[in-house]
């Protein structure tokens, strides 16, 4: 690796699983000290051990991104451990696949509190430290193709990711004067647990639905979590020093086909 993040400290919320773990692992391989902010202590510690075994530096901290005290404490603990904060990846998220006529308000609150509230809280406390440091920083929000592309039974999840897209633009405008860049990545069909769960819920034949989704993608394949880690590294590094307020679609070209599920 090229050590593009040598000496930097990065927080990845939801960093112990799936896309979050791929990003955290890539950052650590590039020289960053990575904090894995995860609700599950066991998952966080397992991810920390995996990164350390691979030669990286990582620390798992328990955090509920929907709880302000928990987020504030996690950022404070990061500073206690490493003395600085350069990158925040607001990756933690959740979803629900419900038809709007059957929507549970409890599900609505859970999705919005985590997907929208978690981004706002993480940005609030990370940006405070980045501002004080005078070094600026990079905040990366993990959105979704569903924030720009209609999919079935996704009103709440899609709405939450649409909000993330606008929050990204607004906070980029608010924080640019402090040298803090804010960008978002919108993954498309990523071959992971969340994507398979979605199709199991909304389709009677999930295997056929996934095959149809694959066929609608210009590049002809589902994405991998590593396909998201690479763009995240770009946005975290100085290679993207003049990039802010941007939504990067990482979807293999699926957005060119309109609604695809």
Positions of predicted regions on the chain:
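Residue(s) in the substrate-gating loop at a strand-loop-helix junction
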Residues: 144
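Conserved glycine-rich cofactor-binding loop
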Residues: 9, 16-18
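Short C-terminal tail/terminal secondary-structure segment
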Residues: 149, 232-233, 244-261
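Active-site helix of classical SDR
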Residues: 123, 160, 168
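Substrate-binding pocket helix/loop in short-chain dehydrogenase/reductase
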Residues: 99-100, 107-112, 213
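Short, small/polar-rich loop/turn modules that mediate ligand/substrate recognition or access, typified
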Residues: 89, 176, 181, 243-245
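Alpha-helical segment proximal to the catalytic Tyr-Lys
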Residues: 128, 173-177, 241
